[in-house]
A protein has these predicted regions:
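A short, N-terminal "cap"/entry segment at the start of jelly-roll beta-barrel domains
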Residues: 1-38, 52
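Double-stranded beta-helix
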Residues: 3-7, 35-36, 98-121
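Conserved short histidine dyad/triad with adjacent acidic residue
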Residues: 39-55
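A generic "binding-loop/recognition-motif" signal
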Residues: 57, 77, 93-94, 102-103, ...
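Glycine- and acidic-residue-biased ligand/ion/polar-headgroup-sensing regions
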Residues: 57-69
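Short beta-strand His + acidic residue motifs that chelate non-heme Fe in jelly-roll/DSBH
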Residues: 71-72, 89, 95-100
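Short acidic-glycine-tyrosine-enriched beta hairpin
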Residues: 75-91
Length: 121
């Protein structure tokens, strides 16, 4: 994780190794005191069904940098998103994705910072 606490910082994939989260899933994180962006690389698609819905108190935007996903949220029609699309998720709204392409890169931005994404110790 790159932390821009009191000066500008850059996240460079060649320098900052990805955190492996599971089979076909890795992320890189950059943050300030109030904002967090997460580059999420997903492989192993297409998936047969969406992930289970989840929610959190953080506001979120998701930019589809590559690939294609189906964005699902409670009470809304699923949105098919392609590279270049951006979606905003209010605090507390249950949501999930379904990978439609073989792989995708999503860039999630959260406010406030997702403390649960920060490794302790």
């Amino acid at each position: 994780m790159v932390y821009a606490k009191d000066k500008v910082a850059a996240l460079r994939p060649a320098v900052e190794p990805a955190e492996k989260l599971g089979e076909g899933l890795s992320r890189r994180i950059i943050r300030t005191n109030q904002l967090m962006s997460v580059a999420l690389d997903i492989e192993g698609g297409p998936w047969k069904e969406p992930e289970p819905l989840h929610s959190h108190p953080h506001e979120q935007t998701t930019y589809v940098a590559s690939g294609e996903v189906l964005f699902c949220s409670e009470g809304s029609t699923p949105e098919r998103l392609n590279a270049g699309d951006l979606i905003a998720i209010p605090s507390g709204v249950p949501h999930s994705i379904q990978l439609l392409s073989r792989s995708a890169r999503l860039v999630d931005t959260f406010h406030p910072v997702r403390e649960d994404f920060i490794k302790k110790g």
